[in-house]
Amino acid sequence: MTELLKTPIHPLYAKYGAKTIDFGGWDLPVQFAGIKAEHEAVRTDAGLFDVSHMGEILVEGPDSTSYLQYLLSNDIEKIKIGKAQYNIMCYETGGTVDDLVVYKKSETEYILVVNAANTEKDYEWMVQNIVGDVTVKNASSEFGQLALQGPNAEKILSKLTDADLSSISFFGFIEDADVAGVKTIISRSGYTGEDGFEIYMQSADAGKVFEAILAEGVAPIGLGARDTLRLEAVLALYGQELSKDITPLEAGLNFAVKLKKEADFIGKQALIKQKEAGLTRKLVGIELIERGIPRHDYPVFLNDKEIGVITSGTQSPTLGTNIGLALIDTAYTELDQELEVGIRNKKVKAKVVQTPFYKRAK
């Protein structure tokens, strides 16, 4: 049996009561105090996540921008220095290699933050598709990453840094910011639907920053609440809403797919064809009318005909309803369309609803 990978924060988990699980080969906390309490802490106050398992890939060199334009679906030329951008890396088929965030440090330096379980695959794909004068480095082991999320995130973080946090706009970042005596990159971003920050530092310093933030009375949050939070906000999870067989257009991520950008990118022609032909399946939000919780891979039916599959589902702690995302035949994606979800040998009534399920008050 392969030993599970551990983040630099791992030695501190037991101290804070973490219950860990195998998540894509990593030993990570699924919960601390409990999923519902943690979820509520992030929605109403603030919570701290150890996300040091995420991958960081550095791209440097004079042709960095044109290389990333070829590799990624969004328009890299639109990113200003000190800003980040959500992106999709596609196969020639239009299917998804990964979804990721690109940070622009300078005209010739970028950091790509990728999903942990995809880090090696992404790195190999990037090296295989190098064009021009660039170097690509998998620097994941050098970074620790924490996410402080929730309406009080700025107020709490400002106690530990002199950096002007209010000046950081959404998807903006600052470098060399001192947090609890540690040099960090602070980005206004996250995966919860709340305001918040993602903080990057050298892996050796991650534990110090983690404990300094928790000392401000912040709750540590596990993967369970991370999943319910992102699902309410309808933020895609690779392996569920996206995969090598699911294109970003099917997943409703058109905002990150710039088919009109001049640069040709890997998968562009396949995505243009798919758009012109019309999508045969689409991701929708569903809410159960009858009792039951939809889960990943449960089938979706209409009058005994299987029309799709649940990609993610949960009992929503914020709304108190049972919700899910489903990839279904486009013909049945109208709001209020009634469907059935196959939950253990039983068909349970559901309907198509507006997404996101949750949107924070600005």
UniProtKB/Swiss-Prot annotation:
InterPro entries the UniProt entry points to: GCS_T (IPR006223), GCS_T_bac (IPR022903), GCST_C (IPR013977), GCV_T_N (IPR006222), GcvT/YgfZ/DmdA (IPR028896), GcvT/YgfZ_C (IPR029043), TrmE/GcvT_dom1 (IPR027266)
Coiled coil (UniProt feature): none
Catalytic activity: N(6)-[(R)-S(8)-aminomethyldihydrolipoyl]-L-lysyl-[protein] + (6S)-5,6,7,8-tetrahydrofolate = N(6)-[(R)-dihydrolipoyl]-L-lysyl-[protein] + (6R)-5,10-methylene-5,6,7,8-tetrahydrofolate + NH4(+)
Keyword annotations from UniProtKB, A to Z: Aminotransferase, Transferase
GO biological process: glycine decarboxylation via glycine cleavage system
Keyword Transferase: yes
Pfam families: GCV_T, GCV_T_C
Annotated Gene3D superfamilies: Aminomethyltransferase beta-barrel domains (3.30.70.1400), Aminomethyltransferase fragment (4.10.1250.10), Probable tRNA modification gtpase trme, domain 1 (3.30.1360.120)
GO cellular component entries: cytosol; glycine cleavage complex
Listed SUPFAM superfamilies: Aminomethyltransferase beta-barrel domain, Folate-binding domain
Highest taxon in the source lineage: Bacteria
Enzyme Commission designation: 2.1.2.10
GO molecular function: aminomethyltransferase activity; transaminase activity
Keyword Transferase attached: yes
Subunit: The glycine cleavage system is composed of four proteins: P, T, L and H.
Function, as annotated: The glycine cleavage system catalyzes the degradation of glycine.
Similarity annotation: Belongs to the GcvT family.
Protein name per its UniProtKB record: Aminomethyltransferase
Lineage: Bacteria, Bacillati, Bacillota, Bacilli, Bacillales
Gene: gcvT
